[in-house]
């Protein structure tokens, strides 16, 4: 007997990462894909969003490819080749996920599904192919060894075939009989029949899996075409600036609706806060100038956001407010979160977190806690606005604190300071 051979596949992990990068490049467009293709015509879930399923496919492929690459096959530790059975089941997860991505994105794989280059098994009726033969092997050897019946007239003529064992050939007495890597026996459940031999060659199995995995390239190209087409479609639909008879809050609501359609609803809360800012009127006249500057900053950000929606792009000064922003955010989002890392705020991380208790959505106890934490910052924030802790409402204190944080950001090296124009209508005079 010869020394036992082992087998190990290598699937390029970069292939799934490249596909994932295509998804992420225009995630807001990818999220709009639904189960609408003809293949889902009779499914109860036809028409619902497919984003979760797409993400599941990507995660399953990524994890399972890593697992398959780590498996060394051919170690006969039990009666049957359980390592191969496990390998086939997990490889099927990858191939099924790729098939699902093709169906969702509308990629026709009929030609690829008819391919016979790996196994060369066209079947008794000439209608077989690599895809069907792989599924037959998995059914017979792994998942349905006591009842394989879906491949009648293709890979068997009996109504049912069964498989008592699957064993590695090399390094065993069987290699003197069978010139293959694995041998399985398929009983056909007929009188006076010894059944049929099924010979498995690992180079053929690996070749088929690698080919089906490579179809991610074709599916990725189709995804990019879908994204480009959808973006161009949106660009052709006008998004008017604020109309003469349109209130500012109505204008913000309209842009919010447009963004939800084109980019998703991730920025809904930012639009809601923009409306709150533009409708805010301070109680103290001492704060009116600072409030107006803050409103103007939001108006400027909304102008940029209008460009984002019209051009379907978040990059560049005319959209994000600055070039090469590593955060991936636009000014519109920076204003909402106002994350300025500077020495004067460095010791107040907990306080800044609790200021959110004053936004009107928290309970009375939390709001009281927010007031305490705001007072502790009065020595910093009070340089920019006037707080009246006795008479101001929670929401007014919250809005004033946000205005103070905005003006602090204008004094430091951060995205907001870089994006806001050097104009007194946005910035306090020195």
Give short role names for the model-derived ranges.
Residues 39-71, 80-111:
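Short, contiguous, well-structured surface segments enriched in hydrophobic/aromatic residues
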């Amino acid at each position: 007997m010869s020394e036992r051979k082992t087998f190990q596949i290598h699937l390029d992990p970069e292939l799934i990462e490249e596909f994932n990068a295509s998804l992420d490049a225009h995630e807001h467009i990818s999220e709009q894909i639904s189960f609408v293709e003809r293949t889902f015509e009779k499914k109860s879930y036809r028409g619902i969003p497919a984003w979760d399923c797409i993400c599941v496919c990507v995660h399953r492929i990524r994890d399972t490819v890593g697992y398959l690459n780590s498996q060394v096959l051919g170690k006969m530790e039990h009666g049957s080749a359980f390592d191969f059975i496990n390998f086939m089941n997990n490889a099927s997860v990858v191939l099924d996920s790729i098939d699902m991505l093709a169906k969702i994105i509308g990629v026709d794989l009929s030609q690829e599904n008819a391919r016979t280059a790996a196994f060369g098994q066209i079947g008794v009726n000439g209608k077989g192919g690599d895809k069907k033969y792989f599924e037959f092997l998995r059914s017979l050897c792994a998942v349905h060894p006591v009842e394989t019946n879906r491949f009648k007239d293709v890979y068997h003529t009996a109504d049912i075939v069964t498989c008592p064992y699957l064993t590695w050939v090399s390094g065993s007495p069987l290699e003197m009989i069978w010139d293959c890597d694995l041998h399985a026996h398929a009983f056909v459940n007929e009188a006076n029949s010894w059944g049929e031999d099924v010979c498995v060659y690992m180079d053929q199995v690996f070749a088929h899996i690698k080919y089906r995995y490579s179809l991610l390239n074709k599916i990725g190209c189709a995804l990019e075409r879908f994204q480009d087409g959808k973006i161009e479609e949106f660009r052709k639909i006008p998004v008017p600036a604020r109309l003469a008879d349109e209130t500012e809050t109505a204008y913000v609501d309209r842009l919010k609706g447009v963004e939800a359609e084109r980019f998703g609803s991730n920025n809904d809360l930012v639009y809601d806060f923009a409306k709150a800012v533009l409708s805010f009127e301070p109680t103290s006249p001492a704060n009116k100038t600072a409030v107006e500057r803050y409103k103007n900053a939001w108006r400027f950000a909304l102008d940029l956001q209008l460009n984002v929606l019209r051009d379907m792009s978040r990059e560049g000064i005319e959209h994000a407010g600055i070039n090469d922003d590593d955060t991936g955010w636009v000014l519109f989002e920076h204003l909402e979160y106002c994350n300025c890392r500077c020495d004067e705020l460095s010791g107040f991380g907990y306080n800044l977190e609790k200021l959110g208790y004053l936004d009107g959505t928290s309970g009375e106890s939390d709001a009281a806690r927010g007031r305490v934490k705001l007072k502790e910052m009065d020595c910093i924030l009070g340089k920019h606005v006037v707080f009246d802790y006795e008479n101001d409402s929670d929401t007014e204190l919250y809005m004033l604190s946000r205005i103070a944080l905005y003006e602090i950001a204008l004094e430091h090296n951060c995205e907001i300071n870089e994006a806001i124009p050097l104009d007194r209508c946005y910035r306090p005079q020195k």
